[in-house]
Amino acid sequence: MNKIDKLPDDAVKIINSEDYVDKKGNIYSFDNRYGHSKDLFIREQTISNGYKYCNVRYCINGKYKNITKKVNKIVATAFIPNPDNLPIVMHKNNNKLDNRVENLQWGTVSP
């Protein structure tokens, strides 16, 4: 993880998580594993099947657990309304590694 000084202005907290996401698709985490200061880091992202994935720390039933999620879904859930409850996140430019909010939209799979 890369340490940084502060969250970007457009970063928002991920629902049910202690982590944050910005409009560029970066995931941020405060690390206090050693009980000292809470250092801020950009979380590492891995690539699988052409998509970026990231471990996010979620609170489930009062307990914290790291869950691997697609970065595009994290960004879209945080910034793009989905009133029709569409199931998938699509990349407008077909580049699955480009998770900027302006490149994402909710959609469905064609039959």
Question: Where do the model's predicted regions map?
Answer:
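Conserved recognition-core residues within compact binding domains
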Residues: M1-I88, N95-P111
